[in-house]
Swiss-Prot record:
Gene Ontology CC annotation, any one: nucleus
Gene Ontology terms describing biological process: cellular response to retinoic acid; ectodermal placode formation; positive regulation of transcription by RNA polymerase II; regulation of developmental process
Compartments, as annotated in UniProt: Nucleus
Bias (Polar residues): 323-332
InterPro entries to which the protein is assigned, alphabetical: p53-like_TF_DNA-bd_sf, T-box_DNA-bd, T-box_sf, TF_T-box, TF_T-box_CS
UniProt keyword terms in alphabetical order: Developmental protein, DNA-binding, Nucleus, Transcription, Transcription regulation
Role this protein plays: Probable transcriptional regulator involved in developmental processes. Binds to the palindromic T site 5'-TTCACACCTAGGTGTGAA-3' DNA sequence. Induces pre-placodal ectoderm (PPE) gene expression in regions where RIPPLY3 is absent. Plays a role in the formation of the anteroposterior (AP) axis during embryonic development; required to establish the posterolateral border of the pre-placodal ectoderm (PPE) acting downstream of the retinoic acid receptor (RAR) signaling.
Record-annotated DNA-binding residue ranges: 119-297
Bias kind Basic and acidic residues: ranges: 333-347
GN (gene name): tbx1
Pfam families the UniProt entry points to: T-box
Gene Ontology molecular function terms on file: DNA-binding transcription factor activity; RNA polymerase II cis-regulatory region sequence-specific DNA binding
Quaternary structure, from the entry: Binds DNA as a dimer. Interacts with dscr6/ripply3.
Protein name in UniProt: T-box transcription factor TBX1
Organism from which the protein derives: Xenopus tropicalis
Length: 463
């Protein structure tokens, strides 16, 4: 794992903080005794079948389960919780547990706030599912946090790991839309820790922005050699977030237990699946994921208010910040309304996907009542091309036939260059295009590929 960190701090890191000692000593000593008790949250779809989660044996899973996150006090923020601080009021510890370790002042005052908590809560009410694939799949919602209380001049590393919630394997009952216990858990997967790629960094850098683990991927490949987190499908997991102080002392291994602090957010626990089981999870992921627009019937902002998920205003702002070509907000102005449909119309004003037969076909293909297969949420880092968004324009009253313009879709690179779509269509298959060069100021070149057909002769040599 250390080799994955390409940073000039790598040489000093070997003296500052022994990462292997952290994973072997700190995490194992996090809760050497006691179980990982998690009381079901309100509306938890698992609670009706499982009144509580009993700890599984550490010998079976090779995990040392952490204590549960204590319930926040009255008036306290429920979005920030430090679960690893001994003596913080957590339950489930036995009388033989180790004495509380006094945390280093560099980490003692650190607090963490979970971003997009409303969205996480909405998924948690339904029973969050995360796709795992052999190649690795990113999480959605992405685990993002805001950190407070760090020493601005000290160096910190940020890590994540995943621990089983219990020792059970689950199956989804479609007739009752609920999860049922299917038996004992499968053999434990190799435990791995994901390091944030910016680690280590100064506390000032971590605190000035939202920390996102968008590079983290989940896999079910036991032989994975890409550093992804390995999980068993149909098992429940709890993500844990760790803040590690890079101790400059040469004997920092002795202080491993006091140089880190762990945070657990119960609303982020999930079931690992290879395909979404709950259709409501599928619909919510499509509605709230900015990279899943291709699977929507229409723009979420055009949905009726009573059918719109409560987290969409938050996710629409997130989508606009991550995707510059997404729809701008509706503020009642005609200019914004025209901008929202900029990519759905060509220069002549013809609405794309406006044909009635096409709308009927799309409505059948994209009907929310049809079962949607898993893996629909492409979390690529690139921006999606607007022409490929299967979006129906509810404002279009009709459409004119394309006639001899069968290629009236704007080019993908025009959007990245900020240019308007070309008035001329793509060359027809009968026209040879190997000598084509774009001359925006040359009428002959512009008319060469017009709908009227190519000229009788064209000089391909230099002029």
């Amino acid at each position: 794992m250390i080799s994955a960190i390409s940073s000039p701090w790598l040489t000093q890191l070997s003296h500052f903080c022994d990462v292997a000692a952290f994973t072997a000593n700190s995490l194992s000593s996090l809760n050497a005794s006691g179980g990982y008790h998690l009381s079901p949250s309100p509306g938890d779809p698992y609670s009706q079948h499982e009144p509580h989660y009993e700890p599984c044996s550490a010998s079976q899973h090779s995990y040392s389960f952490g204590h549960a996150c204590p319930e926040p006090e009255s008036g306290a923020s429920s979005s920030s919780c430090a679960s690893s601080t001994p003596g913080s009021g957590s339950t489930g510890s036995s009388g033989s547990s180790k004495a509380p370790v006094k945390k280093n002042p560099k980490v003692a005052n650190i607090t963490v706030q979970l971003e997009m908590k409303a969205l996480w809560d909405e998924f948690n009410q339904l029973g969050t599912e995360m796709i795992v694939t052999k190649a690795g799949r990113r999480m959605f919602p992405t685990f993002q946090v805001k950190i407070f209380g760090m020493d601005p001049m000290a160096d910190y590393m940020l890590l994540m790991d995943f621990v089983p919630v219990d020792d059970k394997r689950y199956r989804y009952a479609f007739h009752s839309s609920s999860w049922l216990v299917a038996g004992k858990a499968d053999p434990a997967t190799p435990g791995r820790v994901h390091y944030h790629p910016d680690s280590p960094a100064k506390g000032a850098q971590w605190m000035k922005q939202i920390v996102s683990f968008d590079k983290l991927k989940l896999t079910n490949n036991l032989l994975d050699d890409n550093g992804h987190i390995i999980l068993n499908s149909m098992h429940r997991y709890q993500p844990r977030f760790h803040v590690v102080y890079v101790d400059p002392r040469k004997d920092s291994e002795k202080y491993a237990e006091e140089n880190f602090k762990t945070f657990v957010f119960e609303e982020t626990r999930f079931t690992a699946v290879t395909a979404y089981q709950n259709h409501r999870i599928t619909q919510l992921k499509i509605a709230s994921n900015p990279f899943a627009k291709g699977f929507r019937d229409c723009d979420p902002e055009d949905w009726p208010r009573n059918h719109r998920p409560g987290s969409l205003p938050l996710m629409n702002a997130f989508a606009r910040s991550r995707n510059p070509v997404s729809s701008p907000p509706q503020n009642g102005s005609d200019k914004d309304g025209d901008g929202r449909r900029e990519y759905e119309r060509d220069t002549s004003g013809t609405p794309l996907h406006g044909d009635a037969a096409h709308q009927q076909l799309m409505s059948r293909v994209l009907s929310p009542s049809l079962p949607v297969p898993g893996g629909l949420v492409p979390l690529s880092t690139g921006r999606p091309s607007p022409p490929h968004e299967l979006r129906l324009d509810p404002h279009s009253q009709g459409s004119e036939p394309l006639h001899h313009h069968p290629y009236k879709y704007p080019t993908s690179y025009d959007h990245y260059l900020g240019a308007k779509t070309r008035p001329a269509p793509y060359p027809l298959p009968s026209i040879r295009g190997h000598g084509y060069h774009h001359h925006p100021m040359n009428p002959a070149a512009a008319n060469m590929y017009s709908g009227a057909g190519a000229p009788g002769s064209y000089e391909y040599g230099p002029r």
